Amino acid sequence: MQGRLSAWLAKHKLAHRPLGFDYQGTETLQIKAEDWVSIAVALYVYGFNYLRSQCAYDVAPGGSLASVYHLTKINDNADQPEEVCIKVFVPREDPRIPSVLRIWKGANFQERESYDMLGIFYESHPCLKRILMPESWIGWPLRKDYIAPDFYEIQDSH
């Protein structure tokens, strides 16, 4: 079933794939990485002015990685703001997604966390570096094929 936003994107010839609705009725769309920035700008113009959250996950061992964006349309008189969930899937061999930091400033630390934990490279992010793990950490801890080191010494900063 095609939702209202999917119909709007189709009307404007913006490439996407409807994935259905969640239990709260939030429409979920799949967007290709190469189309993400142009669609993100269109969504912002459409009124999705708030990035509620961004996260990422490993779909399956050896499979693709996904970056998930929850966007909300906030205005002065909205009791129940419209929301949409966007999923961008990328291959684990070269996981690159354009950053949307210039559109939604709230993407800054969230994209950095996804980079730190899963190794998704957010192109044109001005400060894409580890945020939770030490800079010397090797690998991406939340990938399903990650092998944890037997021992890792964290240096005391005092």
Swiss-Prot record:
The membrane topology term of the UniProt record is:
Peripheral membrane protein
Protein's gene: ndhJ
- What are the alphabetically sorted keywords of the record? Chloroplast, Membrane, NAD, NADP, Plastid, Plastoquinone, Quinone, Thylakoid, Translocase, Transport
- Record the organism: Cryptomeria japonica (Japanese cedar)
Q: Which GO terms describe its molecular function?
A: NADH dehydrogenase (ubiquinone) activity; quinone binding
**Record localization:** Plastid, Chloroplast thylakoid membrane
NCBIfam families membership: PRK12494.1
Source species, domain of life = Eukaryota
Q: Which InterPro entries match?
A: NADH_DH_suC, NADH_quin_OxRdtase_su_C/D-like, NADH_UbQ_OxRdtase_30kDa_su, NADH_UbQ_OxRdtase_CS
Q: What is its EC number?
A: 7.1.1.-
Q: Which HAMAP family match?
A: NDH1_NuoC (MF_01357)
Gene Ontology BP term (one): photosynthesis, light reaction
Task: Write down what this protein is called.
Answer: NAD(P)H-quinone oxidoreductase subunit J, chloroplastic
User: What's its catalytic activity?
Assistant: a plastoquinone + NADH + (n+1) H(+)(in) = a plastoquinol + NAD(+) + n H(+)(out); a plastoquinone + NADPH + (n+1) H(+)(in) = a plastoquinol + NADP(+) + n H(+)(out)
The function of this protein is: NDH shuttles electrons from NAD(P)H:plastoquinone, via FMN and iron-sulfur (Fe-S) centers, to quinones in the photosynthetic chain and possibly in a chloroplast respiratory chain. The immediate electron acceptor for the enzyme in this species is believed to be plastoquinone. Couples the redox reaction to proton translocation, and thus conserves the redox energy in a proton gradient.
Please provide, in alphabetical order, the Gene Ontology terms of the cellular component aspect for this entry.
Answer: chloroplast thylakoid membrane
- Description of how the protein assembles with itself and partners: NDH is composed of at least 16 different subunits, 5 of which are encoded in the nucleus.
Q: Which residues form the signal peptide?
A: none
Q: Does the keyword Transport apply?
A: yes
In which family does this protein belong, per the annotation? Belongs to the complex I 30 kDa subunit family.
